[in-house]
Amino acid sequence: MSLLARPAVPPDRAPRAHRLITLVPRSEWAYRPRIVATGFVIVTQVFLYVLLWRALYRESGDTVVGLDMSQAITYSVLATLMGTGRVVLEGASQETAQSKIRDGSVVFWFVRPLAARRYCAWRGLGESLYATLWLLGGLTVGVLCSLVALPPSWPAAAVTVVSYALGQVVFHQIGLLVDLTSFWTITSFGVNRLAAFAQLLLSGGLIPLWLFPDWFRSTAGHLPFAATINVPVSLYTGRIPVADSAPYLAEQALWCVLLAVLGRLMWRRAARRLLVLGG
């Protein structure tokens, strides 16, 4: 059977595709040590960031590049919650093209009634929702512990939600594109390492982009990585005023479209090129 020819979806089974949303949460619940490990990593990073920013502001004064200590800590806590939980989650998942190609089960992605691209999209939606639960839980704890400040206004909170949703789409598309390179490489380890480094540095997940030189910030700020963390967190902290948010949201939406088109092209070529390491 050609990988491009898929069986028709039975009418009574089509609505069941939405059940893939629960695939990731149920898998994580089945392996509870992963939840503990993710929580430990996030708590440790937040603790170290709080110590770091308090020490820096004790030496430098009230503000650094226009950010006060409360904004800096809030930025780092939210960036950690948005980035670390998602990365740890993706790293623990075995539903990747690389792992499936190694054991040969990737062929089932292309012979199921549900298209492989839609299967990954539903699963990615579940990953985003699960990561959002970590974000909301950590945000609640951070506010109660006075580590995270509330957004400056309700409009700022609303535009942050929109920006966060767009950022999650970009996050998924970047991860998908990196994973799809497995169809053209013997191993995607190097690509994954490079993408993880770029995501951590260029998204503002490690250090706020506002602290970098102007030339670096102006370049990184227009890359898709910044759309995942820097933009929504900057809107939340008030670093980007609500009145100036339209161009940032438009750029996020543009990256969503461009990455989706590129992903669609890669899916089409991947269906015609399949290398199974197991023979």
Put a short name on every predicted segment:
Residues M1-G279:
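Hydrophobic transmembrane alpha-helices and immediately adjacent juxtamembrane helices
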